Swiss-Prot record:
Binds 1 Mn(2+) ion per subunit. Binds 1 NAD(+) per subunit. GO terms for biological process: carbohydrate metabolic process. Keywords: Carbohydrate metabolism, Glycosidase, Hydrolase, Manganese, Metal-binding, NAD. GO terms for molecular function: alpha-galactosidase activity; metal ion binding; oxidoreductase activity, acting on the CH-OH group of donors, NAD or NADP as acceptor. This is Alpha-galactosidase. Coiled coil: none annotated. The active site is at H174. It comes from the Bacteria. Substrate binds at N151, R287. CDD domains: GH4_alpha_glucosidase_galactosidase. The gene is melA.
Amino acid sequence: MMTAPKITFIGAGSTIFVKNILGDVFHREALKSAHVALMDIDETRLEESHIVVRKLMDSAGASGRITCHTNQKAALQDADFVVVAFQIGGYEPCTVTDFEVCKRHGLEQTIADTLGPGGIMRALRTIPHLWRICEDMTEVCPKATMLNYVNPMAMNTWAMYARYPHIKQVGLCHSVQGTAEELARDLNIDPTSLRYRCAGINHMAFYLELERKTADGTYVNLYPELLAAYDAGQAPKPNIHGNERCQNIVRYEMFKKLGYFVTESSEHFAEYTPWFIKPGREDLIARYKVPLDEYPKRCVEQLANWHKELEEYKTAERIDIKPSREYASTIMNALWTGEPSVIYGNVRNEGLIDNLPQGSCVEVACLVDANGIQPTKVGTIPSHLAAMMQTNINVQTLLTEAILTENRDRVYHAAMMDPHTAAVLGIEEIYALVDDLIAAHGDWLPAWLRR
């Protein structure tokens, strides 16, 4: 083994995300001298990231080197870790297209990056590019581990392990650890006092056990306290990011009905189910505080904030940041040093969750050490939770089959099975919507879709 790893970042123009991941990396002793290869097709964004990463490295006392690439294969050459974070088609034009076309057909969305027509189109745009990374990794860094942050996570991860089973990869999200911190904040307790066991699928995993440590060192079930706080109007607390549109009512109401708390946000969860967004039901939107068109609004705000932050970073002498909640540096450190850690990752269901389809993509706790990323067996999850997840897995199954077999019919079938879409549109309307989305996206989609 070399004395320091090579970390390749595909999509390095995502400057703020790069900053968070590499800020963590540079504060790990075993990774301080890593070779960081930044790759992006946008040379301007790439150079901006280079400036930020150099200042991060210097501020942390890291001694590695940085190289910048617009050629993917060159960036991947001899990599040990490959971090992937990009959005094919960006906010403009593709995200705008997903929202505007669906709205014309009477389908409202909130985020549209995981399921539904928005998630389906994003998967069709994205998976061919992920496959190209797998091709290049096979050729120039076959032993590397891919840390994938690209949505729609389940469909992307599934499509990669189906076609490139030899590539070591894990799909990463921050909803498990992020929601745990949110719930601790809602109850005014220290997040480090929590202990939990979580399982499911990406953006629809549930805390099967959620406990807090008491003064005498024993653990107690946190769910009764959480429910009491919600009923008393003491939870949820205002959005930590100051976003007044996202009030987290949907998840708490689902918690009351299901008995378990889901990991992904209310604005996400509202569009994974058939109950919250319906034409002419403004009462539901008002009652559950569902933020329609949230993702486009967020993109505009984040872009403005990013430009402001970037200017500050470019003029700053040093950049000091707090550790993030992302798992990437934890995984790299554990694989590189052998120091064991536990993370939550999206992986192939091979006997992990008994009552979800084998081969589907599930989110479970994984032990990480010198032996690799080792998912842990969960067993059987509560039947009502599995039933809800299955409605989402249906879409993932059909879309993955569509792109693996180049079968346009399965794209329609995936949209038909989407819980939210099916609750709003008839069959012919769904077909017309898919046709319009494919036409509107044009060359952003694979050529076989337009044959």
